[in-house]
């Protein structure tokens, strides 16, 4: 897989319906010394909404010996280890961002989901936080050169621009709700919990990838992974 190379896409080629912002790929290229025209190792993106089963697909790929980069897990590691990232977060949110060197998730969540902090909206703060973390994750991806990158927010983070191809994992809403209830609520399928999960599902928008796989439980996971590998 590593013999294939591609060129980082420019966001000028992608219409997002919003003013053009500096992409993760551009930031990564600048920090790594690469140009936007540099050949880079082929990376396959794996994405999908909550309860779609993308993590199950990723685990099967790992079992087969592929290097899979879990963006959520690695972002937490980067925050815990990267002093530059830590300082940027402290500059944004203040000294309470870390307690005895440990990332203060509760405090940060309160900041980004509160109406305002020092005159800045929670939405603006979240965007600034993402602007710190996502490029750091992108740079780490290029250093590690995995075969696959798994992320629920692959497109929102801009990390899709580092991927050669993207597989989207999907499932019917009722199955996604059941899976998420079992995972996040210990199987407590109360109306309140179901409504929370449904709201999370409806809040997500997963753009179309190069390959969409229906993970509804009828096709064994190994066969779905075979489909991904057959295409790429």
Where are these regions (language model features)?
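Walker A/P-loop
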Residues: 55
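Hydrophobic anchor at the beta1->P-loop junction of P-loop NTPases
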Residues: 46
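ATP-dependent NMP and nucleoside kinases share a basic, alpha-helical "lid"
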Residues: 140-142, 149-181
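ATP-dependent small-molecule kinase phosphotransfer cores
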Residues: 73-146
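Extreme N-terminal, non-catalytic leader segments
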Residues: 2, 6-41
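Small-molecule kinase domains that catalyze NTP-dependent phosphoryl transfer to phosphate-bearing small molecules
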Residues: 137-141, 161-162, 173, 182-232
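ATP-binding Walker
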Residues: 52
